[in-house]
Amino acid sequence: FARPSIAASVLAFMPSFQIHRSNRLERLVVALGDLLADGVGGPLTPEAVVVQGRGMEIWLGGELAKRFGVWATRMEYPRGLVDRLVREVLGDAALGDAPLSEDLLGWTVQAVLPELLAKPEFAALARYVERDEHGVRAFELAGRIATVFDQYLTYRPDWIRRWEAGDLSDLPVDDQWQGLLWQRVAEQVKRPHLAVAVDQLIERLGEGKPLPGLPPRVLAFGLSTLPPLYVRALAALSRHVDVHVFSFSPAPGLWPPK
């Protein structure tokens, strides 16, 4: 089992960010349980335990119930935690009552796409839906585009920011329809989205001022992957509260030096 460790270059910027690595999930559960047993903020203070998905949530809840006899703490997924941090630090207005969701993106793409198909940049899409008598292809295409746009908001927010600023220079000619379509979608919905809100969150956390509403600490368990946007948010959060990441590393070569 590798003891909590982090490179000195990272430690200088993230004094409360600790990574726990092991090639055995069971050992990571023991380390997590030891931290939970210590408690922070009193027995009624809710812990912020973050997992990748429903499967890990069920398994980890069962393991912790074996240790403590009962386990009733609600676990969160990464996007849910980031969304909550945005609302706590920046206020509900940062995301609005109905933030930009994948479903809303899908309906908006379907609504604005027909008016864009005459443009030369959309020639390939126009050919795809030209014999779509019942609108099935257009509906499915809008859904697939919405899924990709939603992933861009999480994994490539830099693209979204450039497109919204009118800069499509990063796109090949055949892909420029994506930037043009996003500009039209953003103009149509006029709602805040997570990429911009997280940038504002990171900036606010980086100011170093005390902030109300933050969790006493964050315990992230078994995350196999995490978007860079969320990593930056956790790094900024670690300036205020302890952030522990319990990482499953099957190969000893991936562990840090002792």
Indicate residue ranges for each PLM-predicted region.
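Basic/charged alpha-beta structural segments of nucleotide/phosphate-handling enzymes
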Residues: 51-212, 228, 235, 241-242, ...
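N- or domain-start disorder-to-order transition segments that initiate the globular core
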Residues: 13-36
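Short active-site oxyanion
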Residues: 45-48
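Short, Lys/Arg-enriched N-terminal segments with co-localized hydrophobic residues
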Residues: 1-13
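Small/polar loops that bind or transfer phosphate-bearing groups
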Residues: 20, 52, 222
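Conserved P-loop NTPase "ATPase switch" module shared by AAA+ and STAND
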Residues: 214-226
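Domain-scale recognition of functional cores that engage charged ligands
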Residues: 27, 227-231
